[in-house]
């Protein structure tokens, strides 16, 4: 990790974005599967 001040590393952005997307999809599918399909 060399001098990434002022710029966010691309791998960090990808990791955070991927985690958020997977989390949202997981919550959505879990809600739909549990019968709480009105979670939109």
Curated annotation (Swiss-Prot):
PANTHER family: PHOTOSYSTEM II REACTION CENTER PROTEIN J (PTHR34812:SF3)
GO biological process: photosynthesis
InterPro entries from the UniProt entry: PSII_PsbJ (IPR002682), PSII_PsbJ_sf (IPR037267)
Transmembrane segments: 10-30
Protein name: Photosystem II reaction center protein J
Family: Belongs to the PsbJ family.
A GO cellular component annotation in the UniProt record: photosystem II reaction center
Domain of life of the source: Eukaryota
Membrane-topology descriptor: Single-pass membrane protein
Gene label: psbJ
Keywords: Chloroplast, Membrane, Photosynthesis, Photosystem II, Plastid, Reaction center, Thylakoid, Transmembrane, Transmembrane helix
Gene3D superfamilies in the record: 6.10.250.2070
Chief localisation class: plastid
Subunit and interaction comment: PSII is composed of 1 copy each of membrane proteins PsbA, PsbB, PsbC, PsbD, PsbE, PsbF, PsbH, PsbI, PsbJ, PsbK, PsbL, PsbM, PsbT, PsbX, PsbY, PsbZ, Psb30/Ycf12, at least 3 peripheral proteins of the oxygen-evolving complex and a large number of cofactors. It forms dimeric complexes.
Pfam families, per the entry: PsbJ
Localization, UniProt: Plastid, Chloroplast thylakoid membrane
Role summary: One of the components of the core complex of photosystem II (PSII). PSII is a light-driven water:plastoquinone oxidoreductase that uses light energy to abstract electrons from H(2)O, generating O(2) and a proton gradient subsequently used for ATP formation. It consists of a core antenna complex that captures photons, and an electron transfer chain that converts photonic excitation into a charge separation.
